[in-house]
Amino acid sequence: MTLEAIDVHHGYGDETVFDGVSLSVSPGEVVAIIGPSGVGKSTLLRLFALFDSPDRGSITYEGSDVWSVSENHRLDIRRQIGMVFQDASLFDASVKRNAEYGLRVRKPWSERIRHELASIVGRTNGTGPAVEALETVGLDDKLEQDATSLSGGEAQRVAFARALAYEPDVLLLDEPTSDLDPRNTAVLEEAILEARERGIGVAVATHDMHQAERIADRVAVLLGNEILEVGETETVFEAPRDERTRKFIDGELIY
């Protein structure tokens, strides 16, 4: 269930964003994609989420090129990939209904029925996949609260729970804590680590290198249209192979 970018070239018009980028996200690991703002971290996540197709190279899932398979197969793959954007978008409904949304639209019919039944039972006994996901982010005490009344940090936690509830194979997070206070940041980081323990592969795009050190098993350094290096987090931070990586980590490179 590995999601992988292989020698990906991508751009918009005359602007080159990636010139031969390769990166994998495997089950049960957290990969942090670090780099300054505007370098293409979000674009890489969009490619992983199958929102965009690369100009050259391939995105593969379980070894199959996702843009070479049938549309129905690609839709099945999309259902295995969850994404949480930087700015959470919630509906005018309860916290629980927002967390259930992914179960209703992302799963095949057979799975939707199973999760809907679990959700109905959960309304009487306080369980179910959405409730369990909300417990993970510490919001199971706000199930019936209007989601639009939540703080920004709480809304981001609901968005994470919504993606987690339908049990994706891969979870993509785009600067998930960039505007959050320390408490909400800590809750989400703990939830990310719990997702890893469940066997979910997690890719986090972040400019916060301290966060990458706290939660990531591996780090990919994205600078200047390419990934300079990928490696175990401690190794990249303590003994980077590329001099540009060292300068970026030390704050000597300004983009």
Which residues does each PLM region occupy?
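ABC ATPase C-loop
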Residues: 158, 163-164
